[in-house]
């Protein structure tokens, strides 16, 4: 499993802060990718590049029609890390009204990230921890 990252949206500077989760939680902020940016190849980054991954680099399974694999995202309030939950399961329970899984990708790209930016998402996810999976990384469109 990949290293875990603490992600925090800094709306004052319009950046997403990606920091290693652990005793040393410092790291440079990465700007969010511009809408409509070109997709890159799906090759896996080298270990030396992993600390400089932009926000748009997500596992390829993130945008699959069936949703991300169960190892991709684990979310938790940092105050209660002993009770982490799988993001996919947590989100599915909140979105029981969605007609099909075909809407997963547009929902994540448009609605979820917009809600996060506007600050109207559940406070439990305002700070969350990402895990990794075996899938190669890709850049969001």
Swiss-Prot record:
Query: Locations of Low complexity compositional bias?
Result: 33-48
The UniProt record lists the keyword Transport: no
Q: What keywords sit in the KW lines?
A: Activation of host NF-kappa-B by virus, Activator, Apoptosis, Host cytoplasm, Host G2/M cell cycle arrest by virus, Host mitochondrion, Host nucleus, Host-virus interaction, Modulation of host cell cycle by virus, Transcription, Transcription regulation
Tell me the InterPro entries matching this sequence.
Transactivation_prot_X
Q: Where is the signal peptide?
A: none
Residue span of region Mitochondrial targeting sequence: 68-113
UniProt's post-translational modification comment states: A fraction may be phosphorylated in insect cells and HepG2 cells, a human hepatoblastoma cell line. Phosphorylated in vitro by host protein kinase C or mitogen-activated protein kinase. N-acetylated in insect cells.
* Record flagged with keyword Transport: no
Query: Where does it live in the cell?
Result: Host cytoplasm; Host nucleus; Host mitochondrion
Task: Give the GO cellular component terms, alphabetically.
Answer: host cell mitochondrion; host cell nucleus
Entry function: Multifunctional protein that plays a role in silencing host antiviral defenses and promoting viral transcription. Does not seem to be essential for HBV infection. May be directly involved in development of cirrhosis and liver cancer (hepatocellular carcinoma). Most of cytosolic activities involve modulation of cytosolic calcium. The effect on apoptosis is controversial depending on the cell types in which the studies have been conducted. May induce apoptosis by localizing in mitochondria and causing loss of mitochondrial membrane potential.
Q: Which HAMAP family match?
A: HBV_X
Quaternary organization? May form homodimer. May interact with host CEBPA, CFLAR, CREB1, DDB1, E4F1, HBXIP, HSPD1/HSP60, NFKBIA, POLR2E and SMAD4. Interacts with host SMC5-SMC6 complex and induces its degradation. Interacts with host TRPC4AP; leading to prevent ubiquitination of TRPC4AP. Interacts with host PLSCR1; this interaction promotes ubiquitination and degradation of HBx and impairs HBx-mediated cell proliferation.
Q: What is this protein called?
A: Protein X
| Originating organism | Woodchuck hepatitis B virus (isolate 59) (WHV)
Gene name, Swiss-Prot/TrEMBL: X
């Amino acid at each position: 499993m990949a290293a875990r990252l603490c992600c925090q949206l800094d709306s004052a500077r319009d950046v997403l802060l990606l920091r290693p989760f652990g005793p040393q939680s410092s790291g440079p902020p990465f700007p969010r990718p511009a809408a409509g940016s070109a997709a890159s190849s799906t090759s896996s980054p080298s270990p030396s590049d992993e600390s400089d991954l932009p926000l748009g680099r997500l596992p390829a399974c993130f945008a699959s029609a069936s949703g991300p694999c169960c190892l991709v995202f684990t979310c938790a309030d940092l105050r209660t890390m002993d009770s982490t939950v799988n993001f996919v399961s947590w989100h599915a329970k909140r979105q029981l009204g969605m007609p099909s899984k075909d809407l997963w990708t547009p929902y994540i790209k448009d609605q979820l990230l917009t809600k996060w930016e506007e600050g109207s998402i559940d406070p439990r996810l305002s700070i969350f921890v990402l895990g990794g999976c075996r899938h190669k990384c890709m850049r969001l469109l």
